[in-house]
Amino acid sequence: MAEKNERPIKVIAENRKARFNYAIEDTLEAGIALTGTEVKSIRNGKSTIAESYADPKDGEIWLINANIPEYLQANRFNHEPKRPRKLLLHRKQINKLMGAVERQGMTLVPLKMYFNERGRVKLQLALAKGKQLHDKRDTEKKRDWSREKGRIMRARG
C-alpha cells in the first residue's frame, strides 16, 4: 500500500492579541469559502486576521474584516481584499454559536488561519468574552510574575 505524503499544519496568520483581549471559553475549527485568487494569495503568506471577527447573519456565520490581499497575477479577475467570507460549519455548531452570541453576549474571534494536512484553509475560531481593563492588568501581572520566577530559579541554579 502506498504511503500518504503527510503535510504538517502550516500556520498562515495568527491573532496574537486575542488571548490578551478576550477570555476564551471554547475553540473550534471552521472551513472558509474562498475564491481561487484568495487561496493563491494566502499561499503567498500575506493575509492578516488581527482585526477580524465572525458575525452570525441569516443562519450563517461570516468572517468580517479579514484582510487577504489581491493576488498580483490575477489582474481583472481579482477579489476584494476585505470582503465578508462565509465560514463552513455544521448546523449544530452554528446554532450553538449563534445562541451564545445572542443570549450570553459573547464574541466570535478568529485565533489562527492555517492549512490542514489535506491542504485546505481552516480557521480556528474562539467563543470568547471581552476582558475589562482590570482583567487585562491582572493577566499582565501574572505573566510578568511567571517570567520573574523563571529568572530567579535560573539564577539560583
From Swiss-Prot:
Keyword rRNA-binding: no
Region called Disordered, residue ranges: 131-157
Subcellular compartments: Cytoplasm
One GO biological process term: trans-translation
A family per Pfam: SmpB
Keyword entries, A-Z: Cytoplasm, RNA-binding
Biased composition (Basic and acidic residues): 132-151
Keyword RNA-binding: yes
A cellular component annotation (GO) from this entry: cytosol
Family: Belongs to the SmpB family.
NCBIfam families: PRK05422.1, smpB
Function field: Required for rescue of stalled ribosomes mediated by trans-translation. Binds to transfer-messenger RNA (tmRNA), required for stable association of tmRNA with ribosomes. tmRNA and SmpB together mimic tRNA shape, replacing the anticodon stem-loop with SmpB. tmRNA is encoded by the ssrA gene; the 2 termini fold to resemble tRNA(Ala) and it encodes a 'tag peptide', a short internal open reading frame. During trans-translation Ala-aminoacylated tmRNA acts like a tRNA, entering the A-site of stalled ribosomes, displacing the stalled mRNA.
Protein name: SsrA-binding protein
Organism: Rhodopseudomonas palustris (strain BisB18)
